Amino acid sequence: MALSASLHLRQSQSLVMTPQLMQSIQLLQMNHLELSHFIAQEVEKNPLLEVQPADEPTISDREDAGPHPAETGGETDEAAGQSDLYDSAMSRSGERLSEGLDADFANVFPDDTAPQRADAPELLGQWKSMPGAGDAEGYDLDDFVGGRKTLRETLAEQLPFALSAVSDRLIARYFIDQLDDAGYLHADLAETAETLGAAGEDVARVLHVLQQFDPPGVFARTLGECLAIQLRARNRLDPAMEALVANLELLARRDFASLKKICGVDEEDLIDMLAEIRKLDPKPGTSFETGVFEAIIPDVVVRAAPDGGWLVELNPDALPRVLVNHDYFTEISRSSRKNSGEQAFLNECLQNANWLTRSLDQRARTIMKVASEIVRQQDAFLIHGVGHLRPLNLRIVADAIKMHESTVSRVTSNKYMLTPRGLFELKYFFTVSIGSAENGDAHSAESVRHRIRTMINQESADAVLSDDDIVDVLKQAGVDIARRTVAKYREAMSIPSSVQRRREKRALAKAAGF
């Protein structure tokens, strides 16, 4: 067979994932902290990028910059003709990125998606008055970022008053470093003695001293030991209590008959002992500051509109204010025209800066579209609560705003929405559908779980609902659900079975009678 060379002409199409397009996709799924860190790195590398201070006025503060009605689906007149992020990016791939972009903040984020600066006090008041946010009148940032001691600092302050020998303090310091956030000690005494070169008796003696520190229960190695330390501090660790603490697995199973036999007490005494146990803290270290926590900053703020609808706004605190300094580019370009290398570097910086600002603009528009559609779909939840949460999936939102499901998935990742009902992750609003028993509207799984939790919380000791009873009640309410699904939801919410709940409720009822 002879070998020969030949030419073949073939035409094909393929999608090329450019670095800029990959960057735009990554920006979509970044949360506020990740985006701030990424922009800080880009500003450090690119001399043409500037971050505008938050207190500096921008064009977004103009009077015509208003909130976004949820009924519009998050689209503006300017963005109505735009499609998906990917289509928009690919259609501009042949254009010069350095053209048509001013250093104006209006090109970074459109006016129609920015909230009024005058709304800030009202939004801040709403945010602080949310459940779990405390009293808005007494809000003080110092209560959250300063003034609180960690568990290790509190224990270290007690150390000089309890141990005088340097060797004992060394052992104590080692034990303090081995504590977890709950105050439990995860260190073997024999290994500790070998590691520190100390006698086993000294290690055990130091641990006994440390277990008398405040808060009571620290340096325990098991839950039973933690409770025993606290009972000893209350002078309540009698033989019956010791037997109860040593058999916590029976208490977890609500096997009160076996506990009465092991502890040698009657039912009345056992109820008193259980009431004493409930007063103890199983995790004594959690009441202390364990580190620096970052507050969750909502990306979207939803508030009631005067016409009865909802206003959806991007949170200005989560918006990166990035500008391109064209004046600096022009000035430097004049002095570097003779140097082709410097000019090429400046042109590349300008292209990267323009693409970044456009990507941030597109990111803001996309978040706005998705959030507005979620608010439109979950209007009943915002008005009535979790019981009216509708079943929703990514495809419904993607079809409504004419985007791909993957784009919606990236937008809802690690993004939060502040609503009159509280602060929620965007993914919270996407729940599976449970059919209706009467061929009506489907029910959200989250709303069904809420109904199950409410029914169990309202049951009495004489009328504890089994899983089959819950199924019957839900079917009467129009929810078609299987018993195994109810059991799965109940276990996911850490709710015990009806047998265990009946034992506990009867014991509590008898305790209340005494």
From Swiss-Prot:
One of its GO terms (biological process) is nitrogen fixation. One of its GO terms (molecular function) is DNA-binding transcription activator activity. Gene3D superfamilies: Homeodomain-like, RNA polymerase sigma-54 factor, core-binding domain. Signal peptide: none annotated. Residues 57-83 are annotated as: Disordered. A motif (RPON box) lies at residues 482-490. The keyword Membrane does not apply. Residues 393-412 bind DNA. Keywords: DNA-binding, DNA-directed RNA polymerase, Nitrogen fixation, Nucleotidyltransferase, Sigma factor, Transcription, Transcription regulation, Transferase. It comes from the Bacteria. GO terms for cellular component: DNA-directed RNA polymerase complex. Sigma factors are initiation factors that promote the attachment of RNA polymerase to specific initiation sites and are then released. This sigma factor is responsible for the expression of the nitrogen fixation genes (nif operon), glnA and dctA for dicarboxylate transport. The open complex (sigma-54 and core RNA polymerase) serves as the receptor for receipt of the melting signal from the remotely bound activator proteins NifA, NtrC, or DctD for the expression of the regulated proteins. Belongs to the sigma-54 factor family. This is RNA polymerase sigma-54 factor.
